[in-house]
Amino acid sequence: MSGGLAPSKSTVYVSNLPFSLTNNDLYRIFSKYGKVVKVTIMKDKDTRKSKGVAFILFLDKDSALNCTRAINNKQLFGRVIKASIAIDNGRAAEFIRRRNYFDKSKCYECGESGHLSYACPKNMLGEREPPKKKEKKKKRKLPEPEEEIEEVEVSEEEGEDPALDSLSQAIAFQQAKIEEEQSKWRPNPGGPSTSDDSRRPRIKKSAYFSDEEELSD
């Protein structure tokens, strides 16, 4: 079975129904043949009374075919029922559209207040259990942080610490860089000196803060 409803193949046209049967009655009668999605009874525009004709939309075409074979030319409440696969008149999309009944104070079957159609006294087969409401999934909100996000610390490899805002701090920082640079060129204690070590220039510590470095011969 392909995904989605196919009303042109899964809708049963039923005629010669008893006029007293309600939507809920037909739902209970035809549910034995498969999953019923929608029941539509044709009614008179003025009197709102049933014309004895209904469309039963099943979830799949196999259920609709089983229904027509089982109920066609069979008696129901003393009447011979006619059932067949409905002919698509081009309004299939409109037919399967779900209707929302916003006024929950009155029964849409009889128009009286105090009950809904599921428990309408005119249901010949008694009350029907209403469908369960689908629970809406609530979006989980991210918890608000109790403290402000800490600033990311800048490592020495990424650049100078921006906190060096005074001259004394800048001098100390520059001096540490010079000493670190000298330690890289300093030979291991007790090890023989190489010709490369003697050729490398020695950096002379500057007495003041400067971008230039003094080299000694």
Curated annotation (Swiss-Prot):
Residues 120-217 are annotated as: Disordered. Expressed at higher level in heart and testis, and at lower level in cerebellum. Weakly expressed at low level in liver. The keyword RNA-binding applies. It is found in: Nucleus, Nucleoplasm. Signal peptide: none annotated. A zinc finger (CCHC-type) spans 105-122. Keywords: Metal-binding, mRNA processing, mRNA splicing, Nucleus, Phosphoprotein, RNA-binding, Spliceosome, Zinc, Zinc-finger. This is Zinc finger CCHC-type and RNA-binding motif-containing protein 1. The gene is Zcrb1.
